Amino acid sequence: FTITTEVCDLFYKNKKKLPAKMIKDIEAELKNIEKKTKKKFGDLKNPLLVSVRSGARISMPGMMDTILNLGLNDKTVEALKKKTSNGRFAKDSYRRFIQMYSNVVLGVEGHLFEELIDNYKLTKGVLLDTDLDESDWDGLITNFKELVKKEKKINFPQDVKQQLLGAINAVFLSWDSQRAKTYRKLNQIPDHWGTAVNVQAMVFGNMGSDCSTGVAFTRNPSTGENSFFGEFLINAQGEDVVAGTRTPQYITKKAKQDAA
């Protein structure tokens, strides 16, 4: 479901808080997703996980915030592990969520999490995140939560409804961030437009070697040429494509040849 730009306007007029009626509407829309997916938000057997993304009228790549795997906590991650019979995937998804949520909503610097991962990989003697197994991510999840406690003096939130409202607030607030303001000024995008928020059931790109994530364009974004263009990563999630930590593959043969 989409929370419209009008709500963004109301959010700022309401001292940067969601109106009470809107919170009820969000809960009702969440129930619709639960019915369609046959999953329940916060459930300990078949948990619904969602993504929370900006929906600005004009694309502002890298300017607005995104949170994936929302709805995971210390209990639902075990339910996800049991449901999918894939412990590594479940723990990898949880650590990603802790990273994104802590950075976007709680304000913990993102590089602090990456440093923990890099140091762990050095200790273990591996190069890639994909070389880490379930027990590795388990240990890093503990380290991540300790980092949040140290930096923000709070425990990482376990209440899934609190997580969702925090993420929606953060996306609205990202419209007013300095980087977004600068981008709008450079690209003549009006400040009063605001952003929408899209809440969607998660589809996973990190469940194994038969899963992937990527971006695609109907035109080449560099040249404007009328040709399909895109790139993807196997066994990854969206942030990996834009973060530059792994080299993506090209979707088309022509792009592969041009890059060679």
Predicted features and spans:
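Nucleotide/phosphate-binding sheet-loop regions of phosphoryl- and nucleotidyl-transfer enzymes
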Residues: F1-A260
